[in-house]
A protein has these predicted regions:
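Substrate-binding/active-site groove segments that recognize
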Residues: 131-153, 165-168, 172
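Second-shell loop/turn segments in exported
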Residues: 79-90, 102-103, 123-130, 150-161, ...
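An acidic, Gly/Ser/Thr/Pro-rich helix-cap/linker signature
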Residues: 1-107
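Solvent-exposed, polar/charged alpha-helical surfaces in well-ordered, non-transmembrane soluble domains
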Residues: 91, 95-98, 102, 114, ...
Length: 267
């Protein structure tokens, strides 16, 4: 009798477990407006809405044309579903944007160019590419020196946030004097002024975004627009952060020195 009672209890518990799990599974189905298909995975993935237009430094860019729309769609999906990387960049922005924004403003550079720094280095101040670009703005050594940074065996100012930003501003000003268009300036930062100038002349394009370029540069301009969209309204793209989640500014002090530092740990 005792044995039967235990079996009865186990059977009843199993039945209850199944009864409880069915509504949970049904509740996790993904139903679109057109189809009633049950998902085989316990979550839904939906594409972010592509806006009809984007604004970069006051310039309205029409995204309704199919090729622009699809290129923007690609980058929005990339940032939306690169969950950990995008989340980390949003957190880092709280640390670095307050430093960068006044420097851009003081140099007459559009505030939107802070997003270029995001796609260059993921807001990692010690980022270094396989090609040798370094810092938040990913300057190559030759370009860094051209725009006033000291780069040698002892000093590398590409890692100095304020000085590297000032150098980036000098580049932006020079490029804008040539193109008169900030989006062309951003494309040249990736591909080089020589290439963008030659392609603008060769392709007779009215806008840099319409140039047929290498994939990296072609994506670069739309990545710039997409990251602005995501950072401007992270909640809309599923990134829900509290103030305490954001990375704070790092306190520091300046120490003057007149000799080389061979051993930093002993300095």
């Amino acid at each position: 009798m005792k044995h039967i009672s235990i079996n009865y209890i186990l059977t009843t518990a199993l039945a209850l477990g199944i009864g409880i799990s069915i509504p949970v599974l049904i509740g996790s189905t993904c139903l679109s407006e057109q189809h009633s298909v049950q998902s085989e995975v316990p979550y839904c993935v939906t594409p972010p809405t592509v806006p009809e237009q984007a604004v970069f430094d006051g310039d309205t860019i029409d995204l309704r044309r199919y090729d622009r729309r699809e290129r923007m769609d690609r980058e929005l999906m990339s940032f939306t579903y690169m969950h950990s990387s995008t989340m980390q960049m949003i957190k880092r922005a709280n640390r670095y944007f307050p430093v960068i924004e006044p420097l851009l403003k003081a140099n007459g550079i559009p505030d939107d160019f802070k997003y270029l720094m995001v796609i260059e280095s993921n807001l990692n101040p010690i980022a270094r590419s396989p090609a040798g670009a370094a810092g938040l703005w990913q300057f190559m050594p030759v370009t860094a020196r051209e725009f006033g940074l000291e780069v040698n065996d002892n000093v590398d100012e590409r890692y100095h946030i304020e000085k590297a930003t000032a150098a980036a501003c000098r580049y932006f000003k020079q490029a804008y004097a040539k193109y008169g268009d900030w989006m062309a300036v951003s494309a040249s930062y990736n591909a080089g002024q020589g290439r963008i100038s030659s392609q603008l002349d060769k392709q007779l394009a009215d806008h840099a975004m319409d140039l047929w370029l290498a994939e990296e540069t072609s994506r670069y301009m739309f990545r710039l627009l997409a990251v602005k969209e995501v950072f401007g309204n992270p909640q809309r793209f599923g990134f829900l952060l509290k103030r305490e989640h954001l990375y704070p500014a790092i306190p520091y002090k300046e120490v003057a020195g007149d000799t080389e530092i061979s051993e930093l740990s002993n300095f």
